[in-house]
């Protein structure tokens, strides 16, 4: 007599888990999504291994915001087209808001599909150039002021065990890795830290 109850209890548990996963997926897609930092391109604002939640409501929702939902176990297969097809074409957004200079944003690369976490320094229609390592927006150089150095231990960082790049002379394992630190101020007055990794081809 107890077996049917156990079976019913098991099925209820499975239903609860599936329902919780669906709710978590909706919450992750529409409201907040967790990210961790895999590289040092945003030092010293964001460090390798840092964990953050991204507010997906900041700039509203577009066609690209909608998910494709597939749960093979229950035969659920909902395409993004079925959910947000009415938003296709142009730059249609719901509850849209314009991004601002200095915002740290997450976007999906259109070619490889990877998520990138970067800082927004220019707005649509503006011309951005890099000359001798300096950023120019519409032909005007962005203000840069020296702010000492950023020091860290030369040791594997994060899940990928990346080694930090050093601007000082050859640094042994567990030595102090130094990079020049600057404060960059954008045209709207927003400031942030940047690091100099030595001169390289992308400086021009």
Predicted regions and their residues:
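Aromatic-capped interface at the extracytoplasmic side
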Residues: 26-40
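Soluble "head" domains of membrane/secretory-pathway proteins
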Residues: 2-14, 35, 44, 48-204
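Hydrophobic membrane-insertion alpha-helices, especially the h-region
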Residues: 12-30
């Amino acid at each position: 007599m107890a077996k049917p109850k156990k079976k019913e209890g098991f099925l209820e548990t499975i239903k609860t888990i599936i329902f919780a996963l669906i709710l978590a997926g909706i919450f992750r897609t529409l409201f907040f999504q967790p990210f961790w930092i895999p590289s040092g391109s945003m030092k010293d604002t964001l460090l390798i291994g840092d964990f953050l939640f991204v507010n997906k409501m900041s700039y509203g929702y577009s066609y690209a915001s909608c998910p494709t939902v597939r749960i093979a176990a229950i035969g659920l297969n909902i395409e993004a087209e079925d959910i947000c097809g009415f938003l296709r074409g142009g730059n249609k957004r719901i509850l849209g808001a314009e991004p601002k200079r200095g915002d740290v944003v997450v976007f999906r690369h259109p070619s490889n599909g990877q998520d990138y976490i970067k800082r927004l320094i220019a707005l649509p229609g503006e011309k951005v150039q890099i000359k001798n390592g300096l950023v120019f927006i519409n032909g005007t150089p962005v203000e840069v002021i020296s702010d000492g150095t950023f020091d860290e231990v030369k040791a594997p960082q994060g899940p990928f065990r990346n080694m930090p790049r050093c601007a000082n002379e050859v640094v042994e394992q567990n030595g102090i890795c130094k990079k020049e630190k600057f404060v960059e101020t954008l045209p709207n007055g927003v400031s942030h830290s940047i690091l100099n990794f030595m001169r390289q081809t992308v400086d021009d």
